[in-house]
């Protein structure tokens, strides 16, 4: 990192165009697992120096591009995109008597998911009609322990019961109140196995999948949730959750924040459905509207299908990898004319 800006200047001096590509803000908030690591090594400062030195910077949204332009005016936007012919985006959704609500993500989203804590409890009267999915469950990782006498730091693999995914699971199961004791006993074994009868449970744990097949998990549910806290790191994120849900024709309930404001239009006006393509939750309404929006869709299941179709129409051409790659290729060609 330290020598990168100097190297970039040397390359530019030789007539070589240097392009930096970035899709995450350089300084995550304090609750993020890697915040301390970045601060200790001043990685955020080094990233900004590289962005300043680059001939061009590529990123995924105009929101993030405007932030980068504070350091480098030559910023171009190429959004995240999907190959619609890739098998992981063609998995069929099987029918169910229940309306399935799902979340799919990684291990750094505890504070985002806290926005919906209490939602499952509020939906208790509708529980016989609902089933929840958490996709990406993982017990891998390490924990750093510090010897109080010597200050020595040692790393060890986390124990299964230490995984942050258990905290996710407690949010989606109302602290395991909505599942049977027998199923809870199975979950506590932390075995990546099918549970016979899981289709009858109110919650399903879905283990992590490789990057080339994780999106198949969208086929498991009908309504996709995308809660994010309103802070600079999240505002600079891409709208990938919108794109993925759209290609799978899922009804989406999302935070009315940053990347989700790019393509989404709220589909409710004074309790009546309008021409929007998703349901958005304002910051001031996090305490109530996640449950209200799910309830609205449970009571109007035809809107689950309609919103999924509308979102698909929004994303299917704009975020088709073939089109985005063509545009990117044209940009590269323009640099060497």
Predicted regions and their residues:
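Active-site proximal beta-strand in glycosyltransferases
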Residues: 11-29
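Conserved catalytic-core segment of nucleotide-activated headgroup transferases in glycan assembly
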Residues: 83-89, 94-219
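Donor nucleotide-sugar binding/catalytic pocket of nucleotide-sugar-dependent glycosyltransferases
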Residues: 52-90
């Amino acid at each position: 990192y330290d020598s990168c800006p100097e190297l970039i200047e040397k390359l530019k001096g030789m007539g070589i165009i240097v392009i930096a590509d970035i899709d995450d803000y350089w300084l995550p908030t304090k609750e993020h697992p890697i915040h301390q690591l970045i601060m200790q090594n001043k990685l955020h400062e080094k990233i900004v120096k590289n962005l300043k030195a680059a001939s061009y910077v590529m990123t995924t949204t105009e929101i993030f591009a405007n932030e980068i332009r504070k350091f480098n005016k030559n910023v171009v936007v190429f959004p995240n995109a999907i190959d619609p012919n890739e098998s992981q985006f063609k998995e069929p959704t099987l029918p169910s008597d229940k309306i399935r609500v799902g979340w799919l993500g990684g291990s750094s989203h505890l504070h985002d998911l806290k926005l919906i804590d209490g939602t499952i409890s509020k939906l208790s009267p509708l529980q016989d009609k609902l089933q929840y999915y958490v996709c990406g469950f993982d017990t891998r990782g390490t924990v750093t322990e510090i010897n109080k006498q010597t200050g020595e730091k040692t790393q060890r693999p986390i124990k299964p019961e230490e995984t942050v995914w258990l905290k996710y699971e407690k949010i989606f199961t109302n602290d395991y109140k909505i599942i049977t004791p027998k199923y809870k006993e199975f979950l506590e074994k932390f075995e990546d196995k099918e549970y016979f009868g899981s289709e009858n449970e109110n919650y399903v744990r879905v283990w992590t999948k490789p990057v080339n097949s994780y999106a198949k998990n969208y086929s498991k549910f009908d309504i996709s949730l995308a809660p994010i806290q309103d802070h600079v790191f999240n505002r600079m994120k891409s709208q990938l959750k919108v794109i993925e849900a759209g290609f799978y024709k899922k009804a989406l309930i999302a935070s009315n924040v940053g990347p989700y404001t790019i393509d989404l239009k709220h589909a409710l006006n004074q309790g009546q459905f309008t021409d929007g393509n998703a349901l958005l939750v304002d910051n001031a309404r996090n305490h109530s509207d996640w449950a209200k929006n799910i309830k609205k869709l449970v009571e109007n299941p035809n809107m689950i299908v309609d919103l999924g179709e509308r979102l698909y129409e929004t994303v299917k051409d704009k975020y088709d990898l073939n089109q985005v790659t063509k545009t990117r290729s044209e940009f590269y060609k323009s640099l060497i004319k």
